[in-house]
Amino acid sequence: MQHTNILLAGATGYLGRHLLKVLIEKQNQVVAIVRKPNQIDNPNENYLEIKQAEVTKPETLRDICKGIDTVISTVGITRQKDGLTYMDVDYQANMNLLAEAKKSGVSHFVYVSAINGDKHRHLKIFEAKEKFVDALKTSGLNYTIVRPNGFFSDMKDFLQMAKSGRVYLFGSGNQKFNPIHGEDLANAIVENLSDYNKTITIGGPDVLSLNDISKLALSSLNKPIKITHLPDCLRRFTIWTLRTFTSVKTYGPIEFFLTLMAEDNIAPTYGKHHLKDYFREEANTLKR
């Protein structure tokens, strides 16, 4: 189904760029929000309008949803920067968008959160996301909550470790999940734009353990398989130490990563891109 007027917030991020490409390929009329005009090339002015605004500054968003049918927001941060907190971005910036959407009579708001965010509200990064999810569900607008597994781009950390010739894991490394490529996730979101008031939990086509991912990373760099398993108590101690002695800016992303890596996070499978191929492509870049 073609959606004629879509506002895309977060268009310059990993997922946002894939979404922009898919939306235009499907001949949607897209308004992309950017902080700087040169952040996105506009190869097709027939389908894309670029508007400069900052989602954390509501005065720059005034009437930005006028004439829009659907808002898609991928707005969120993993690491706090520029003096902005998770609450400033993941919650309040999306609330700013939601307020404009309601004012302009937008019919559908799509928000990209993360897998098991509702289960891990105690984590600072999820606290902000889930607070917005709650607000969106009670806003009166039709909504879609997308809960993807980890992105392929997040798996680069395994490649960085593999460059040294060894990957370090906490615990057994048998925890499983199915990361997803940005293009696959973008396609899934666009395919489901006609479905309202639902939550979509989604992952890539391959369910892999942390050991599997470590082996793929090492193999892609032609390294021997060397994986060191650290006691899980060290993971828990690391989280406690960081929460006790550092700011949320420091411990937030590490707490998020170490918590989710300690359990299975398996979502319904989708897509055609495989992590093995992605690692090979990225490894070729690292070798140059």
Question: Where are the language model's segments positioned?
Answer:
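Glycine/proline-rich active-site loop of Rossmann-fold NAD(P)-dependent oxidoreductases
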Residues: 153-160, 191-200, 223-225
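N-terminal Rossmann NAD(P)H-binding glycine-rich loop of SDR-like oxidoreductase domains
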Residues: 3-26
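Non-catalytic, hydrophobic alpha-helical segments
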Residues: 15, 71, 185, 189, ...
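A hydrophobic C-terminal alpha-helical subdomain
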Residues: 232-288
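Substrate-binding strand-loop-helix patch
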Residues: 176-183, 202-220, 233-237, 273
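NAD(P)H-binding glycine-rich loop region in Rossmannoid oxidoreductase-like domains
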Residues: 7, 38-96, 100-103, 116-118
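Substrate-positioning beta->alpha
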Residues: 171-192, 198
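Glycine-/Pro-rich loop/turn segments that contact NAD(P) or position catalytic residues
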Residues: 77-163
